[in-house]
Regions:
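Helix-turn-helix/homeodomain-like alpha-helical modules used for DNA recognition
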Residues: 62-83
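DNA major-groove recognition helix of helix-turn-helix/homeodomain DNA-binding modules
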Residues: 47-65
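Residues in the recognition helix of alpha-helical DNA-binding motifs
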Residues: 12, 26, 37
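Recognition helix of helix-turn-helix/homeodomain-like DNA-binding domains
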Residues: 29-45
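A detector for short, charged/polar N-terminal pre-domain segments
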Residues: 1-5
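Short basic helix-loop element that most often maps to the first helix and adjoining turn
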Residues: 9-22, 82
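Residues in the helix-turn-helix
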Residues: 22, 33, 52
């Protein structure tokens, strides 16, 4: 499993309408960890934290799309509640 890119994490949060603080809370990681992971220049996250963020976002309905020649991406697997 390839690690998440900073753009994928930011896009996943945007799809869920989550703030960085919400992602930090849901993943039980520090806000500074989330901010570093989302910064393309300092993208730095351990494999364990990457997996934690992936699992939290996937549980919330995000699906990560492999590069497949067109670049990695994200989409919602199911509609948000109330939509």
């Amino acid at each position: 499993m390839k690690s998440l890119s900073s753009a994928q994490i930011r896009a996943a949060r945007a799809l869920l309408r989550w703030s960085a603080e919400e992602l930090a809370r849901e993943s039980a990681l520090g806000l500074a960890t989330i901010r570093r992971a989302e910064n393309a220049e300092t993208h730095s996250m351990t494999a364990a934290n990457d997996l934690t963020v992936r699992r939290v976002l996937e549980a919330a309905g995000v699906e990560f799309i492999d590069e497949n020649g067109g670049g990695p991406g994200v989409r919602l697997r199911k509609p948000l509640k109330g939509e």
